[in-house]
Each structure stands twice: as structure tokens, then as C-alpha cells.
């Protein structure tokens, strides 16, 4: 969690300095969601997420160097500098990408779940999304299929209360949006997204259900972003007040975890300081690596446009039983 926080803080700095271009959506305030869920996954499980993807990428184990290089648009990034902030990807980790179109990745997650079931595996696909996704048509079609075919997908709604600048209450007739799962006859639950242990408990149950019973789950995780929607958005003062932000920051997930660990005697101030300094050094190393990485050559624009159909990585069809 602390690595994600320190990484995102430096991303904000890099964006202000013009080292990161294009869109950039920070994960500050929501770190308990990625940490509490991804820490439960096996290496062969799958993850697919939205454009706010840096936190999940780091939680899954992507190298901070590679993530930062991608943000800087450099050739050593995970997409060779072509994807940028919204399109982290690592096939070796079954991290199937951040996706820039709201809701477009939800059918892909459902397709991954179908592939798992078709091949007789016991893996799980975890699909992260923001609360605005629930008002897209693709969301409904994908969850209906998952409920109908009983697919091993855990759909995690990171409800941070605002879709860009629109409050949930102004956009959704149902405010407890996990209840939408009842329309597709799938298990559903709501949990506190600022408490990493609450997230972990809820996601563990959903993963067990997917792995042992091949059943999907719709999980609404109530969280809050401490930054604007993107780097072009004001932190407060437009659609939300500073007083509201200050109130939510009293439940900073990292602060809550630190307090719990200190109360239980598991973490001292010296331990925390040492860890923090180590993580800051890790992020600085990622920054230095990204700056030293070359920019992609112009001809790289024409590479990776089409899949190489001669590759032995193309999966052979699997006969159904």
C-alpha cells in the first residue's frame, strides 16, 4: 500500500514537470482495495482493470521501473511506451491491462471467465471497475452472461463516489449498487474499502466461491480518491468541498493500517520510517530508470499493430467434453 502511495505521489510530480504526458489517473486513497484483493490471488489467476491501473499493476508485482518507464513513454515500459498511464499490461503476471473506455473491459473479464470454465481450470478472474461502469450497457450484458453461465469472475466496484465530477446520487437510481447483482442472480456484497482487512475478508469469500463453485460475485467496495479524477481535475472546490475531502482523509487506509499494526505491537515508528525510506528509494530508482530509458523510434508506430499469427503463442482450440 505504501509503495503505491509513494509511487503515485512521484507520478503527480512527474506530470507537473511534463515528464508524463496524456491522461494520468492516480490511485491515492484507494490502495486498500488493490492490496486487500490482489494479495489473495494465485500466480495463474487473472486481473483486468480500468484506466486507474497503476496501483493494481504494482500490487500484482509489476516492476516499478517498468511501470514508470511506461508512464514516461519510454521503450522499456510494459507497452514500449505506447500505452502510457491507462494501459499497463504484463502477460507473465496475467495482468490483462488497464482499459481506457469506461466499462469496455467488463465483457473481456467475462470472456476470461468463460475461457477458464471452458478449459476446465480453477483459476479466477478479478475485474476492477469504477461505480460509473454500472450504468453502461456492457456491464449489464456481461454480468447477465456471468450469472447465466456461472463464470468464475469477481467483479469489484471501486465506488469512490464520483464519476469524474458527477456524484453517484446524481447518476444512479440505486445507491447501494451491489444490489444490482440481484438482477443477474449472482452473489453480492458491500464492504469498507478503506479497511484493508475488510476488503481481504470480502474478496477471499468471493474468490473461494469462484474457485470451488464457479460462481461470480459482485462486490461493491466503498472507497474514496484523495486526488482529482485525473491530473487535469481540481482536488476539491468544484464538485466536492475541501471539508468533505478532509473528513474522508481521516480514514486514510494507510493511516488506519499503521494504527492497527502499532496497537498490536507489530510495527514501531522506527520500522515505519525505515520501510518508508526504502520505498522512496525504490520509487526514485524507478524514476531514474525511466529517465535513462530511450524514447521509442518513430518506426515503432507501425509495430505491434497486428498480432503475429505465426507465433507459437497462439492458443490452439480446446475440444469441449
Residue ranges and their predicted role:
Residues 2-21, 43, 256, 263, ...:
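Cofactor-/ligand-binding subdomain signature composed of acidic, glycine-rich
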Residues 4, 43, 57, 278-285, ...:
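A short structural micro-motif
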Residues 288, 292-321:
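C-terminal intrinsically disordered, low-complexity extensions immediately downstream
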Amino acid at each position: 500500500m505504501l509503495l503505491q502511495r509513494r509511487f503515485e505521489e512521484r507520478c503527480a510530480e512527474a506530470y507537473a514537470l511534463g515528464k508524463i504526458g496524456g491522461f494520468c489517473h492516480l490511485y491515492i486513497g484507494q490502495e486498500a482495495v488493490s492490496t486487500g484483493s490482489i494479495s489473495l490471488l494465485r500466480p495463474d489467476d487473472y486481473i483486468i482493470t480500468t484506466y486507474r491501473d497503476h496501483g493494481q499493476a504494482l500490487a500484482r508485482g509489476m516492476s516499478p521501473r517498468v511501470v514508470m518507464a511506461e508512464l514516461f513513454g519510454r521503450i522499456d515500459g510494459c507497452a514500449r511506451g505506447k500505452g502510457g498511464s491507462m494501459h499497463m499490461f504484463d502477460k507473465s503476471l496475467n495482468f490483462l491491462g488497464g482499459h481506457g473506455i469506461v466499462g469496455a473491459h467488463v465483457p473481456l473479464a467475462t470472456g476470461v471467465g468463460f475461457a477458464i470454465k471452458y478449459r476446465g481450470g480453477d483459476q479466477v478472474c478479478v475485474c476492477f471497475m469504477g461505480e460509473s461502469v454500472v450504468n453502461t450497457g456492457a456491464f449489464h450484458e456481461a454480468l447477465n452472461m456471468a450469472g447465466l453461465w456461472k463464470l468464475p469472475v469477481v467483479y469489484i466496484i471501486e465506488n469512490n463516489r464520483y464519476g469524474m465530477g458527477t456524484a453517484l446520487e446524481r447518476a444512479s437510481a440505486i445507491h447501494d449498487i451491489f444490489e444490482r447483482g440481484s438482477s443477474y442472480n449472482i452473489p453480492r456484497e458491500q464492504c469498507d474499502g478503506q479497511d484493508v482487512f475488510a476488503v481481504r475478508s470480502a474478496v477471499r469469500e468471493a474468490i473461494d466461491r469462484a474457485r470451488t463453485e464457479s460462481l461470480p460475485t459482485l462486490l461493491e467496495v466503498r472507497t474514496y480518491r484523495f486526488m482529482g479524477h485525473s491530473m487535469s481535475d481540481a482536488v476539491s472546490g468544484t464538485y466536492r468541498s475541501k471539508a468533505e475531502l478532509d473528513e474522508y482523509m481521516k480514514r486514510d487506509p494507510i493511516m488506519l493500517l499503521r494504527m492497527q499494526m502499532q496497537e498490536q505491537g507489530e510495527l514501531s515508528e522506527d520500522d515505519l520510517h525505515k520501510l518508508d525510506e526504502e520505498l522512496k528509494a525504490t520509487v526514485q530508482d524507478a524514476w531514474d530508470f525511466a529517465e535513462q530509458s530511450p524514447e521509442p523510434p518513430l518506426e515503432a508506430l507501425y509495430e505491434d499493430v497486428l498480432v503475429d499469427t505465426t507465433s507459437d503463442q497462439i492458443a490452439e482450440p480446446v475440444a469441449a467434453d
